[in-house]
Amino acid sequence: MAAACPFASPPLKSDFELSESSNPLEIYAQFDDLRTTCPVAYTSQMGGYWMLTRYEDVKNCASDTATFISSVKAVIPSDPRGTRRPPLNTDPPVHTPYRTAIDRTLKASRLKTLEHILEAHARREWRQLVDRGRGDVSADFGANFAAWVEVTWLNLADASAPVLARTAAAWVNAWREQNKEEVRFHSDKLYDMAKALFRDRRQSPRNVENDPASSLLAERVDGQRIPEEKLM
């Protein structure tokens, strides 16, 4: 029997509203309660969506790509600009060439070679936070370390890390606030970095097993290169 789309007639009443607390214990408590009382819950927040709270439900839905798709909504809240990019906002088989190219650079053998580099970045960023004696673990450590992970994985110059950290953090905050103009402003900066990267790799291709941009440029869709606008 085909599954029915829940948004054909969304519930009139929300089952929950996400806690605004920054206390992890309170957040976990809300999820524990939902798992017990309403494991498949609906909220009208952010345009309305359903949330699964039990592992088996999440696993089964993630494995059923015919019923549960990404091409309608993949991120909550949605991009305020209405922009949709592969592979995140596409379903199989459309996303397959992109995932193939990306997965090629995430094999265990490559990640093993990056382990000591990323560990050094993590230790340095954490030490800076500790030496200051104060700070925000998410903003001061998480954002910076995530930028170093991207820089290392993409084979960017080290000087890109601080710029990437600041721009990505500002972009995420603007997205959360659904500030369309700010999202576009910071997104354009990220696109400029991506365009420069692909321009360099076209001129000087690298090993597709170790370089995501080179891997994407080498991938083909029906015998054709991935279009420029879908590489970003």
Report each predicted region and the residues it spans:
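Active-site substrate-recognition loop segments, prototypically the cytochrome P450 B′-helix/B-C loop
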Residues: 1-138, 142, 147-165, 169-177, ...
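Cytosolic ligand/metal-binding cores
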Residues: 227
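Cytochrome P450 catalytic-core helices
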Residues: 231-232
